[in-house]
Amino acid sequence: ALVLIDKKNRKRERKLKGFTKEVSTGTKSISFFLSPSDVKNTSYLSYNWDDPSKDNDSWLYLPSLQKTNRISGGDRSNSFMGSDFTYADLDGVEIEDYTYKIVKDSDVVDGADCWVIEATPKSKDVIKETGYLKTLTWIRKDIFFGVKGRILVKKGKKVKLWSAKDIKKIDGVWVAKTQQMTTTKKKKREHSSIFIIDTIAFNKKLDDSLFESEAMQRGY
């Protein structure tokens, strides 16, 4: 589920189902919105290539227009379906595009000791693509897993606060079943979004046809 919370604490919930498949050249993912009716059958398809010189590909299908829109590099900093998460947040970043430094060797988050790592984009192109100037991430030392983030947004002098909760090991993989992103300005909350995973399974056989543009239009 994706829960959107405005500054007056009014909530809207969107149900979705997603699939991800590792292929020889990278990772393919597709998500289908199930409800409410205004977003039902909207779908998002992304290809994240292992080759850092190759741009990732992603598309959004809007059933009301019966149209599939390609998400270009300049659009990846845009909001995903009205949420505080961007397309770039969903697709992830190229590690090689940033310089890193440990700004704090020890900080405790939810009882777990963490490193605090600062990531700075190496180029203006990366800033344009992500919309972010700098990111602080709290990484748990015991499981090498990100649990908290503070993101400096390029536009509007805003700061995003990210957190990962309900962290479980499922089929040998560490997963945050709840992720929240909050947009703030002058330390005041403007909007929040929460991704909640109800059920998750790994190592399932998925047909390649599920990750093609035709599948977006067929819906789930």
Regions found by a protein language model. Name each.
Residues R14, E22, T27-K28, N78, ...:
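Compositionally biased, low-complexity repeat tracts
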Residues K17-K21, T99-V108, K165-I167:
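Short amphipathic beta-strand and strand-loop transition segments with alternating hydrophobic
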Residues A215-M216:
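Short, low-complexity polar/charged micro-motifs in intrinsically disordered terminal tails
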Residues A1-S64:
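N-terminal mature ectodomain segment of secretory-pathway/periplasmic proteins
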Residues G219-Y220:
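Short, solvent-exposed mixed-charge patches
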Residues K21-V23, P36, W49-D51, D107, ...:
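Short polar/acidic secondary-structure junctions
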Residues R10-R12, V93-D97:
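A beta-rich soluble binding module of mature secreted/lumenal proteins
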Residues L34, L45, D57-Y61, K67-I71, ...:
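Gly/Pro-enriched, hydrophobic low-complexity segments
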